[in-house]
């Protein structure tokens, strides 16, 4: 049986004037229309094709070699292209827009905005469907991340404490406000780092490396910038946090630790309004 809403490697069983028919197992033969047949298939791979399976406008299984923006079981930020009496329709990169039923909204949506959704297969209709109700699709079991581990993040929503983000398509995490030093919005994809996995299972995130490796990296960055600026920079431990963030992308606290370590090592001199190479 073909996996609807996912990529499948399927065997070609029939050539016709309007496309290829692929073996969908219990689902029967699935059409790959001519417009989706690759022109450069190596001869040894002619009998098998990697295709995405979904339902066309007539609710028939169809194959495509086009790449959707998201597969079943994944999260993504998608643009609302239409809102009508049926529901909310999203652009997911395929000719037939993706339906988000009104029952799966968290709030009212309008055309042109972006929304973070999870994509699932409706068990009754076998239709690929989107939902903005994310909690039920995130893993609630204890996470096994380690502090400093690099992860993929999808920023999902703003909160009073910062931004909630989906970690590796599996878990909720939180980027606290004091860890944000650049423009942030829901739907943004970022590389991030595990800061802490708390005893209650909640995960704190950072947009910068953490731990000793991060400190070493920041120290090197400060020294390199000093060398590039004739050994002096108009910044110090008394500078405004905004200036520090714009120059190095870190918090004032982390910056003070870094220049303090460089000072102790005799590598720099700290003045009230600047730092200099020793």
Residue spans of the language-model regions?
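Single-stranded RNA-binding regions, centering on S1/OB-family and related RNA-binding modules
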Residues: 1-278
């Amino acid at each position: 049986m073909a996996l609807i809403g996912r990529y499948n490697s399927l065997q070609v069983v029939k050539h016709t004037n309007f496309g290829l028919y692929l073996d969908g197992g219990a689902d029967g033969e699935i059409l790959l229309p001519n417009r989706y047949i690759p022109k450069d298939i190596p001869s040894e791979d002619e009998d098998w094709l990697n295709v995405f399976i979904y339902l066309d406008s007539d609710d028939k299984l169809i194959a495509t070699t086009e790449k959707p923006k998201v597969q079943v079981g994944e999260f993504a930020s998608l643009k609302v292209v239409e809102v009508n009496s049926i529901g909310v329709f999203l652009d997911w990169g395929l000719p037939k827009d993706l339906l988000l039923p009104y029952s799966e909204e968290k709030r009212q949506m309008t055309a042109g905005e972006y929304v973070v959704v999870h994509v699932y297969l409706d068990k009754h209709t076998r239709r690929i469907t989107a939902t903005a109700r994310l909690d039920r699709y995130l893993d609630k079991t204890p996470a096994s991340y380690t502090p400093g581990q690099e992860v993929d993040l999808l920023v999902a929503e703003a909160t009073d404490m910062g931004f909630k983000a989906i970690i590796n398509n599996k878990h909720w995490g939180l980027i606290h406000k004091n860890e944000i030093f650049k423009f942030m919005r829901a739907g943004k994809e970022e590389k991030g780092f595990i800061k802490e996995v708390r005893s209650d299972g909640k995960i704190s995130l950072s947009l910068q490396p953490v731990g000793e490796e991060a400190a070493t990296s920041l120290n090197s960055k400060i020294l390199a910038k000093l060398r590039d600026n004739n050994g002096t920079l108009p910044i110090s431990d008394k500078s405004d946090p905004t200036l520090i963030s714009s120059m190095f992308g870190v918090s004032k606290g982390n910056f003070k630790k870094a220049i303090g370590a460089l000072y102790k090592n005799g590598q720099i001199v700290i003045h009230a309004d600047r730092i200099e190479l020793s």
